[in-house]
């Protein structure tokens, strides 16, 4: 579960490495974000020459969480780190590749484009 001030890794090749959550979108009482939710983030660490730079504010969709997700069959999928993919103003991924695995739950949230860019879908 991701809340305000949470630090996340970036799972795409947009140029950002670390981001911090500054707002969880989805209603006035939406305090935490789970897998597939959209949050507003600030770039805290970026590589030189990337598409984004430090201090920029973007939306991002969460693709991996330490808390994990429980499937209908009772199995749980957890990851070592929290990660997200940065989105532009039209809610499309900024990067052209997604590193690491993503979960099938993104399909229900209408993020099929991220699933097609990912190396592995669990």
Swiss-Prot record:
Lyase among keywords: no
InterPro entries: Ribosomal_uL14, Ribosomal_uL14_bac-type, Ribosomal_uL14_CS, Ribosomal_uL14_sf
Gene3D superfamilies recorded: Ribosomal protein L14 (2.40.150.20)
Domain of life from the UniProt record: Bacteria
GO cellular component terms given for this protein: cytosolic large ribosomal subunit
A single GO molecular function term of this UniProt record: structural constituent of ribosome
Keyword list, A-Z: Ribonucleoprotein, Ribosomal protein, RNA-binding, rRNA-binding
SMART domains noted in UniProt: Ribosomal_L14
Keyword tRNA processing: no
BP terms from Gene Ontology: translation
Known function: Binds to 23S rRNA. Forms part of two intersubunit bridges in the 70S ribosome.
NCBIfam families, A to Z: rplN_bact (TIGR01067)
HAMAP family: Ribosomal_uL14
Homology family: Belongs to the universal ribosomal protein uL14 family.
Subunit structure comment from the entry: Part of the 50S ribosomal subunit. Forms a cluster with proteins L3 and L19. In the 70S ribosome, L14 and L19 interact and together make contacts with the 16S rRNA in bridges B5 and B8.
UniProt name for this protein: Large ribosomal subunit protein uL14
């Amino acid at each position: 579960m991701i809340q305000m001030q949470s630090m996340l890794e970036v799972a795409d090749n947009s140029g950002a490495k670390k981001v911090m959550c500054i707002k969880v979108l989805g209603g006035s009482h939406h305090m935490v974000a789970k897998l597939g939710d959209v949050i507003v983030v600030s770039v805290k660490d970026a590589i030189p020459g990337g598409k984004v730079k430090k201090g920029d504010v973007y939306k991002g969709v969460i693709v991996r969480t330490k808390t994990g997700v429980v499937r209908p069959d009772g199995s749980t999928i957890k990851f070592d780190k929290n990660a997200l993919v940065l989105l532009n103003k039209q809610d499309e991924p900024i990067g052209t590749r997604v590193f690491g695995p993503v979960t099938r739950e993104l399909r229900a949230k209408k993020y099929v484009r991220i699933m097609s860019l990912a190396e592995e879908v669990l």
